[in-house]
């Protein structure tokens, strides 16, 4: 009887563990120019479970790439990152973000120009907002600039819409362009 109870308890623990682990994942959303590049740079960080290219910040529901790139929807190309905070902190994701954008350029990023390529950190809650502001202040200090010189916008998270399938994992699916 004890052996059966122990076996049953072990099975229940094994079955419930992945659900608990999945429930502990957190989400961050970053816009920083072309989502292909941002997705590629963030998804390989230890502790990041997945990164999805998409759109955030605009008014239109279920926007398409064509609509967003027309610069009429208010959306930015963005990446939604699901991460394990026991393996990588939101602050570490922010440090990676700042290394992958030009924080002094609010008109797009690098060769990608326009509102849909504007750098934005979308914050999900007060803790993320405080961490994002602290990271912006640190980035400004590191650059020797006043905080007001940074053009990365910090905004409350808007609805995130995944981009079309051909945009997902673009760097891996087009390795000739990304090696």
Q: Each predicted region: which residue ranges?
A:
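Short, intrinsically disordered, low-complexity terminal segments
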Residues: 18-20
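Flexible coil/turn and secondary-structure edge motifs
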Residues: 22-179
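Bacterial N-terminal signal peptides
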Residues: 5-16
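N-terminal secretory signal peptides that target proteins for export/translocation
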Residues: 1-2
